[in-house]
C-alpha cells in the first residue's frame, strides 16, 4: 500500500513541477492504511514540505509504526531540489529520530549534516555521529 506525498513532472532534463498532496488528504491516506492492513514496515521517500513531514511523524507515533526506513529524497537525479528549505530541519528533527534505517545518498548526506562528504571514512563518521544522537 502507498500514500502519495506528491506527483512530479520530470524527465532527464529536470523537474518542471511538483504537486503536493494536502496534509489533510495525506493524513486520510495514512489513516486508511493503518486502520486496515497494518504494515510490517514503512518506507518514506520524497516529502517536500514540513507540513507533510509533521503529518507522517504524527501518524508513525499514533499508530506505533515499526521497521521505518527513511530514504530522504531531497535532490532529483538531474539536480533539482525536491524539498523546501524549511523542511530539511523538520525532517531531521521529526523523521530521522523515528527511522530504523536511513538511506541518504551523498548529496542528501551533505544537506542533512551540513558537511562535505569526501571519502568513505567521512560517511562512517557521519553514521557514527547520527547514531549517537
Model-identified regions with their sequence ranges:
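Conserved N-terminal subdomain of the carbohydrate kinase-like
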Residues: 1-70, 74-77, 81
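Conserved beta-alpha-beta core of the PfkB/ribokinase-like small-molecule kinase fold
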Residues: 44, 49-125
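Conserved small/polar residues in nucleotide/adenosyl-binding loops
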Residues: 126-131
